[in-house]
Amino acid sequence: MQFSENTPPGILPCQSIEVLIAGGAIPSDTPLDVDQVQPASLDLRLSDQAWRVRASFLPGSRRVEDRIADVSMHTIDLSGGFVLEKGCVYIARLQERLTLPKGLIARANPKSSTGRVDVFVRLLTDSGARFDDVAEGYDGPLYL
């Protein structure tokens, strides 16, 4: 699958997402579950690592984990589950990462179920200038 400036804009169907996964553009700490691939999206999963931080941030020209070191209150092991405290800010590394080909960008939207439980979620990437947007050719980890 080739992407370029001539590729028409739009949302990728599940078949294209599956090609990206098979081609290594969406590697994961653990194998992807078949039900993660939706008709035009991919459900992402939390890793075992999270941080409670003083405030949300955009990393600017830095790596997310370098910025976390500046504002982290403590590290959280999610392997046994964890209850979020209301009014607190957390950042969690995702199991999936991206190695986007040229000509392809990505955008994240929270699942409606997170809003129903009053959780506000934004995606962060290394050197990201905007929440929820993944730049063309991005190669790196993802965080919520």
Where do the protein language model's features map onto the residues?
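Non-catalytic terminal segments and appended small domains
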Residues: 1-143
